[in-house]
């Protein structure tokens, strides 16, 4: 694999922490998100727009119980996406998850957290691609607008944040462009 996965043990630790919250959690295994009907049937309660709901339905495989599926399939997890119904839980959950070793926590939306194995970042992906294509770091450029783009904006020869992006992205970028 290109980047490390979160081990099965660590994935179960993450999911067992997250299940204590009013949250929709989707681990990714073999490039597909895994979800359960109680999440899919109530996506609006987790703040997902109609467009996001369509994307989720198209990219998730349904199982009766996500955690039981992860336990039984015994495969490492590529990523865990979490959508929270109560926004005040986001930073509380982030703090609780920060005790899990070997993971990085980021966010791409106002109501989500994304858990990846340490080292599985957009910045590392950009540098891998540049090396694969024979391009120097200085000759790379990246655009971003959110927390999950920070490593990429910092890694790129030129990092450009969107004018309507989050402050954390703007601070990581070399330049800020129009919206």
Predicted features, each with a name:
Residues 13-17, 21-143:
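Conserved acidic, metal-coordinating active-site core of Asp-based
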Residues 5, 72, 115-117, 164, ...:
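Generic structural "secondary-structure junction" signal
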Residues 126, 136-178:
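Acidic, Mg2+-coordinating phosphoryl-transfer loop and its flanking beta/alpha structural elements
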């Amino acid at each position: 694999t290109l980047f490390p996965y979160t081990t099965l043990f660590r994935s179960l630790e993450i999911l067992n922490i997250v299940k204590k919250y009013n949250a929709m959690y989707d681990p990714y295994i073999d490039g597909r998100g895994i979800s359960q009907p109680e999440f899919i049937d109530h996506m609006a309660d987790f703040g997902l727009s109609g467009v996001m709901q369509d994307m989720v339905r198209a990219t998730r495989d349904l199982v009766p119980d996500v955690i039981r599926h992860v336990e039984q399939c015994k495969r490492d997890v590529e990523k865990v996406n979490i959508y929270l119904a109560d926004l005040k839980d986001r930073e509380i959950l982030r703090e609780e998850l920060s005790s899990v070793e070997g993971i990085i926590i980021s966010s791409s939306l106002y109501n989500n957290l994304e858990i990846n194995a340490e080292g599985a970042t957009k910045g590392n992906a950009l540098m891998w691609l540049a090396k694969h294509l024979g391009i120097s770091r200085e000759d790379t450029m990246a655009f971003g607008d959110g927390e999950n783009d920070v490593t990429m904006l910092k890694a790129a020869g030129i990092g450009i944040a969107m004018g309507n992006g989050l402050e954390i992205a703007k601070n990581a970028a070399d330049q800020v462009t129009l919206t």
